[in-house]
Amino acid sequence: MKLVNSLAEVTSAVKQCITNEMVENGLLNDVETFIPSYRLDEPMELPGIWLFEHPTIESDKKGSLSNLIYLKTPFEFVCIVYDEDLEQSEILGKNLAARVGHTILKNKNLITDDGRRIFNNVKFRTLYPAGEVQIDGKTNKTPATSIVLEIEYFVDWLKCNKI
């Protein structure tokens, strides 16, 4: 995979995994909003998922040739589900986060046009309460739950061309 294309390709594939399941009978068919970036001004209908991409670093794996490098990028999915009962809202948020994890694993074998898998590996990193979100028109804040998944992939430095 070319370096200049790989970072965008991996991010695009992660987004595609989510949107593939936001259909009737999909794992995320109840999700109203998917925000695939750091946009803070985006209106959100709930249930919702907000994607944050963390810094990409070198993976622990080593390439078999000097021009191959394995990278890993953590992706954080903040999941928010509103319920009048805050405890129920937290439970539903954890359920949505678990379904996001299932979605990425279910769709991780996405194939590129040239027949390669985009993800070499997907690792669970953490599931945690991510604070609270104020929802317009609601008096109570809603709990948010984050799941962090780490995507591993390789790039070939010799194929680093201008896009």
Spans of model-derived segments:
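Intrinsically disordered, low-complexity regions of eukaryotic proteins
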Residues: E32-F34, P55, V78, D85, ...
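Small/polar-rich, solvent-exposed N-terminal microdomains that initiate assembly or binding
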Residues: M1-S66, N107-F119, N161-I163
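Short, charged, solvent-exposed linker or helix-capping segments at domain edges/interfaces
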Residues: Q88-S89, L158-I163
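Extracellular/virion structural assembly segments
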Residues: S66-Y70, I80-K108
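Acidic-leaning, charged glycine-interspersed low-complexity segments
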Residues: N20-G26, E45-W50, K94-F154
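Oligomerization/assembly interface segments of phage tail-like spikes and tubes
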Residues: N67-E84, K141-V155
